[in-house]
């Protein structure tokens, strides 16, 4: 009997250990899921708030996000002396005081970040380590969160630290968020914060490492009443109303909506900010439209002026072309007249040499007639400047003498022939 009772006691102890282990696993899963979900909501509220105002230390959305991220990075962080030996093996100075029994001051996620993020190019680890007014490890971790957000490299830091799985295993226990599947979701969530311009002051009480970070869950809680609960509330309202008058029954009376005054004030403030932003955008667009209309009118006026100049230049070119064509025709006519006069003068000179003096007088008469004709022909005023070389006396004499020499060759032979000898 005693052995049986002892065996039953041992079995109950074994069953209790299994229940405790399953309960611990369930609690760890709930913690991870809660922190990741709240972190996602916090990032969304930060992005929404950044559309209306600058995010700084006074923003409640940022303070809540910083507390959530600190809780995530501190989830199941080891406190054993093995991590201390690992840090001393890497020749990394320990944060806080080290006693004969191990690590003195409480650990924080900064001890993990400064080891796992050493491979990030142009990291801020050394600058944060050298801060004079930031002494504790937790305060340096909070300063690192702010600097990484201002540098828009927080997602890069977290991704680099999570890829160093060996270092992560050294610092965190099983069931930690950074060791689970939620770690990849965390890096993706933080990537959206690169679009926000943060402005922080690293000298203040907000970096005090003595006070732990507390998450405010109220902004992310929303109660949705089920349909069964709504119907039961309606029945209860009907029952309460029937005490006054059994005939009066409310028609589908819904549950009363109770809104907090602060939530209404915040919504009104957001709507007002959106309205002001819309008005500013409208004014900017109206000014831009007016500027573009002025530029368009100026361009149209310049286009008209250029078209008028093109038409004037085309007309001037046409007139000049017609004038040049007329001058060419006049030059051709004068050239033909000069050629006919040269031919007549050559014939007259030939006839003078071949005929007797009486006939030469007739030739002189013909020459006088030709001279009178040439004198009677008036020069065109438009050709005086262009034909100066043709109207000069020297050129005219040289031209006539040249042509007369050409024509004198054949008549001399005719004069020596017997048929042309004078009787």
From Swiss-Prot:
InterPro entries listed in its UniProt record: Run_dom, Run_dom_sf, RUN_RUNDC3B, RUNDC3A_B
Compositionally skewed regions (Polar residues) per UniProt: 240-250
Omega-N-methylarginine: residues carrying this PTM: 13
Coiled-coil residue spans: 293-341
Region (Disordered) residue spans: 1-20, 232-258
Keywords, comma-separated and alphabetical: Coiled coil, Methylation, Phosphoprotein
Highest taxon in the source lineage: Eukaryota
PROSITE patterns reported in the protein's UniProt record: RUN
Keyword field contains Transmembrane helix: no
RUN domain span: 56-205
Compositionally biased spans, kind Gly residues: 7-19
Description of how the protein assembles with itself and partners: Interacts with RAP2A.
Family: Belongs to the RUNDC3 family.
Protein name according to UniProt: RUN domain-containing protein 3B
Species of the source: Bos taurus
């Amino acid at each position: 009997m005693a052995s049986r009772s002892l065996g039953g006691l041992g079995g109950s102890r074994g069953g209790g250990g299994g229940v405790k282990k399953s309960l611990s696993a369930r609690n760890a899963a709930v913690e991870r899921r809660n922190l990741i979900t709240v972190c996602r909501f916090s990032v969304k509220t930060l992005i929404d708030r950044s559309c209306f105002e600058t995010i700084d230390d006074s923003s409640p959305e940022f303070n809540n996000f910083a507390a959530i991220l600190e809780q995530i990075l501190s989830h199941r962080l080891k406190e054993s002396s093995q991590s201390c030996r690992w840090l001393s093996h890497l020749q990394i100075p320990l944060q806080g005081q080290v006693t004969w029994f191990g690590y003195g001051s409480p650990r924080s996620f900064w001890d993990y970040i400064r080891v796992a993020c050493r491979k990030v190019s142009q990291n801020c680890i050394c600058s944060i380590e050298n801060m004079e007014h930031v002494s504790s490890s937790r305060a340096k971790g909070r300063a690192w969160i702010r600097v990484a957000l201002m540098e828009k490299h927080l997602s890069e830091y977290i991704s680099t630290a999570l890829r160093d799985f060996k270092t992560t295993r050294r610092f965190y226990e099983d069931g930690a968020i950074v060791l689970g599947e939620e770690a990849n979701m965390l890096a993706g969530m933080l990537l959206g914060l690169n679009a926000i311009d943060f402005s922080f002051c690293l000298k203040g009480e907000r970096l005090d490492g003595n006070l732990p970070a507390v998450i405010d869950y109220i902004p992310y809680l929303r109660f949705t009443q089920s349909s069964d609960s709504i119907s039961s509330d309606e029945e209860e309202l009907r029952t309460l109303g029937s005490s006054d008058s059994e005939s009066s029954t409310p028609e589908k009376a819904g549950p009363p909506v109770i809104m907090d005054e602060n939530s209404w004030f915040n919504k009104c403030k957001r709507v007002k900010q959106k309205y002001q932003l819309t008005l500013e955008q409208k004014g900017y667009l109206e000014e831009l439209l007016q500027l573009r209309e002025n530029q368009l009118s100026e361009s149209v006026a310049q286009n008209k002026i250029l078209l008028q100049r093109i038409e004037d230049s085309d007309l001037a070119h046409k007139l000049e072309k017609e004038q040049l064509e007329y001058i060419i025709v006049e030059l051709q006519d004068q050239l033909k007249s000069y050629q006919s006069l040269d031919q007549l003068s050559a014939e007259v000179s030939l006839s003078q040499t071949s005929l007797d003096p009486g006939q030469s007088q007739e030739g002189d008469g013909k020459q006088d007639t030709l001279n009178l004709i040439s004198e009677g022909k008036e020069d065109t005023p438009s050709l005086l400047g262009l034909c100066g070389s043709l109207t000069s006396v020297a050129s005219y004499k040289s031209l006539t003498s040249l042509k007369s020499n050409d024509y004198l060759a054949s008549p001399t032979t005719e004069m020596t022939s017997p048929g042309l000898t004078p009787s």
